[in-house]
Design a protein with these regions (language model features):
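Positively charged, solvent-exposed patches that mediate nucleic-acid binding
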Residues: 1-116
């Protein structure tokens, strides 16, 4: 589970990331990022009905949370991030999702230099 201080909780915070954030796309997901001026990075996860029914959407969000939790020690501070699942994510394995998130974090320059 992602620690509470690393979660975007308010709808208004997620809306700000959607409106003002910069985006990077991958066939499995979309990453939107906005600077938050804080000493931590926070995350939210979205899976719309295009991904599938409720069970499939919840699995997609669980996969994304687990992958971000794994990358969290290597992610720079001061960012609000929104990960939006795309339809292909429902059939993807944990390794594929991990690779996709890693690629997007690298392209967004969010991974610190000493990360693996």
């Amino acid at each position: 589970m992602l620690p509470p201080q690393h979660r975007l909780k308010r709808t208004s915070e997620v809306a700000l990331v959607r409106q003002q954030g910069r985006s990077w796309r991958h066939p499995l997901l979309i990453l939107l990022v906005r600077a938050n001026g804080q000493e931590i990075s926070r995350f939210a996860f979205v899976a719309s009905r295009f991904v599938g029914k409720a069970v499939v959407r919840n699995r997609a969000k669980r996969l994304l949370r687990e992958v971000v939790r794994h990358h969290l020690p290597h992610i720079g501070t001061g960012w609000d991030c929104l990960l939006i699942a795309r339809a292909g994510l429902s059939q993807a394995s944990l390794e594929e999702v991990n690779a996709a998130v890693g690629q997007l974090l690298t392209r967004a320059h969010l991974l610190q230099e000493n990360s693996d």
